[in-house]
Amino acid sequence: MTPDHRFLDDVTETSTRVDPALFIDDPETAVWDESCDVLIVGVGLAGACAALRTAEDRSIDIIAIDRGLGGGASKLSGGIIYMGGGTSAQKEAGVEDSPENMAASLSFETGTLFRPETVVCFARTSTRFQPWLESHGVRLGGPASDAKISYPETASLYFSGNETTALGRALATPAQRGHRAKPSRGGEPTGLSGAYLLPPLLASIDRQPNIRFFRQTRAARMIVDASGEIVGIEVLRIPKGLARWRHALAYGMGTNMIISALRQAGRLHKIAVAIEQARARPVRIRVKKGVVLAAGGFTYNRVMMAKTAPAYLASVPLGTIADDGSGIKLGMTVGAGTAMLDRISAWKFLYAPASWTKACSVGPDGERLVCEELYGARTGEAVFEKGGGKGWLILDQPLQDIVVGEIAVMKKMLFQKIQFKAIINDYTASATTVEGLAEKIGVPADVLAATITRYNHDIESGAADGMAKSEKLRRKIEAGPFYATSIGADLKLSPIPALTMGGLVCDEVTGAVLDPDGKPVPKLYAAGRTAIGICSNYYVSGLSLADCVWSGWRAAESLKGHGGAKGLGK
């Protein structure tokens, strides 16, 4: 075992400090406070799925720990799970799909990151996500939507990725695969559906006779024997009493969207951390079969991000303060390898309104920025990687009128109403000429004029779009005045949220964490955003949560002795 301590000192005021692994001579004679077969670090969707799937074998004793109350970033998410191949919801809505068709579609996102057979296995396994989740109290189903939307207002099954784009259609037949969780007590969702997805799973965990769920408990260091094999873990747990109650209140309120919007979350985070530091007590847990690291990514650790992905520091972290890289660091202290730590998924959606995709996007150099109809993660990547955090949509008066009209009639959640008002009134510039518009937004006038001229000429001449935009979305930008709507990262009321996509390297079949030489680290598994996953190359809505289910199941099947992904057909 060769420990890697590169990031141990990269902490913020809300981070969990991870210490180097503790070596002990003999685990059998050591003093332990608790003992289990399997220990799961982090109980978001990945950890919850790993715990519940492992618990199906009643002979396995499980302890699951979470820094907060459980749910993690998954509970704060849109609650979309990307699954297909013929799910119950798809069949009920008349959506035709197959595992092979889904895998072909996903190849646009996964690229060469995973073997084709792994992507097919993921697609085939996803057909079983729905009944399993429903068995634990989650509600899923239709109706389906045919619209091009970033997040559905009423539909619960929609095109959540690049399925309907020209590039997507070239690979597979489009099918709605974004499944939105519904309220467990009935009715349709009225808010972000992560709040409907996680609570039933957490309640199910509490009902399992062979799972002990230690809330308000954070992992501090791994414990290994003289050979370097994992034999336990040391955690810091807040004892019962007033401190635990106060911590739960501060931690929970700190994740509230309204409180965050009012910029009061930071104060609550500090209260929670102060309680952790003052009152948490060390607990040593003996682990016999294995550890699953499912503690999220590191989007809230801006010190770590400054080293790995500095271009994305202007993004807004999506998750909780527990997304601090602690799970990744724990793995590294026992020799785990990492990859793609510079890979960030940052989202800037150009739909809805759908007609924004008919505009021409440009960067600060005045050149075309991105294919406007692609999923928001591709746009966000272009804004940061090509535009240095800046970008605009260029529209003419007729197109601007259409966009404003679409915004007026579309159904919007409260946060969307606030965003659109700011975008139209505060984040859009106008001028009578393209050159005048360029001067207002600070891009080279000659380059912007040439970009728009070329864009229009290709449409007039029948030439293919330079970025493969669908023909139905192409229209000339020629009737002034002209408009530039900012899609940059500096918009307070329309920020670009981001998740980290890199993490521990895992075996595609077993979920075992690998060292830098590609050898398994004994008794160590990882899931969700602590690990490289199906969504790590390119993310689309629901793919991270789907990977949480998949990777959690995979680790569980390995711990049950079923060979990881090989056991997912059982």
Locations of the language-model features?
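Conserved redox-cofactor binding core of oxidoreductases
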Residues: 10, 15-17, 121-281, 302, ...
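An anion/pyrophosphate-binding glycine-rich loop and adjacent beta-alpha core
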Residues: 328, 337-443, 447
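Extreme N-terminal leader/targeting segments of oxidoreductases
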Residues: 1-38, 56-57, 269, 534, ...
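N-terminal Rossmann-like FAD-binding beta1-loop-alpha1 element of flavoenzymes
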Residues: 38-64
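A glycine-rich dinucleotide-binding beta-alpha-beta segment and adjacent secondary-structure elements
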Residues: 447-534, 538
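Glycine-rich FAD pyrophosphate-binding loop
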Residues: 56-78
